[in-house]
Amino acid sequence: MVTPVTWMDNPIEVYVNDSVWVPGPTDDRCPAKPEEEGMMINISIVYRYPPICLGRAPGCLMPAVQNWLVEVPTVSPNSRFTYHMVSGMSLRPRVNYLQDFSYQRSLKFRPKGKPCPKEIPKESKNTEVLVWEECVANSAVILQNNEFGTIIDWAPRGQFYHNCSGQTQSCPSAQVSPAVDSDLTESLDKHKHKKLQSFYPWEWGEKGISTPRPEIISPVSGPEHPELWRLWPDTTLEFGLEIKL
């Protein structure tokens, strides 16, 4: 992004991705004094890593709804557990199944960091603030895998799953999520609530509340970029879903 400004203008704000993509301010051919304003200059910039594209064009990452589940404090010890599902704009994964073999290919690229919690994050004492902490999930989602390159993300991707352990009859193991359930999404637009029922126990996969951090691993291995999701502010969709178990 290049925005023309003059010496009299206020500094501008530019939201960019990780600065490791661009070189440091080492070029001294730019105008250094007000009287040099308007002089012709040539600047060459070399990128160390391929850029990650966002949008609907081929080779770009697409937007999607990301879900997080938090526990709501119960009124009394005998009250049923209640959870709130909070959703916001994120990046669409190419693979949606937690047990898919494609995840295993990215294990060697697992970043260092705090592992995501094994339990559903609890709300803080202030009910208006969610527990937000960067963490590394047990498995990565593949955001892109084509001729443009392979991009993965180690942020948690909350989904509902059926626990089929010990079940004697047919049990669907696929996830059930507002991000992929059109009927549920449509009902949220009108009622903001939905009751989920199943003959099998529900489990919430990939616990934790963390931002997406896309990372290119092919044709070269690049750094994580935790700021890219902020480029979707104009299309952000946020809603709450109350679930009682």
UniProtKB/Swiss-Prot annotation:
Any Pfam family matching the protein: HERV-K_env_2
PANTHER family associated with the record: ENDOGENOUS RETROVIRUS GROUP K MEMBER 113 ENV POLYPROTEIN-RELATED
Region (Truncated surface protein): 1-245
Note: Has a type 1 genome. The HERV-K(HML-2) family contains type 1 and type 2 genomes depending on the absence or presence of 292 nucleotides at the 5'-end of the env gene resulting in Env proteins of distinct sizes. Despite their overall retroviral envelope structure HERV-K(HML-2) type 1 envelope proteins lack a predictable signal sequence. Subgenomic RNA transcripts coding for full-length envelope proteins have been detected for both type of genomes. Intergenic, closest flanking genes being RPL24 and FLJ23047.
Keyword Metal-binding: no
Entries under InterPro entries matching the protein: HERV-K_env, Retroviral_env_glycoprotein
Tissue expression from the record: Expressed in lung, placenta, testis, peripheral blood lymphocytes, and teratocarcinoma cell lines.
Keywords annotated in UniProt: ERV, Transposable element, Viral envelope protein, Virion
Keyword hit for Membrane: no
Name of encoding gene: ERVK-5
Compartments, record wording: Virion
Protein name per its UniProtKB record: Endogenous retrovirus group K member 5 Env polyprotein
Function: Retroviral envelope proteins mediate receptor recognition and membrane fusion during early infection. Endogenous envelope proteins may have kept, lost or modified their original function during evolution.
Family under the similarity heading: Belongs to the beta type-B retroviral envelope protein family. HERV class-II K(HML-2) env subfamily.
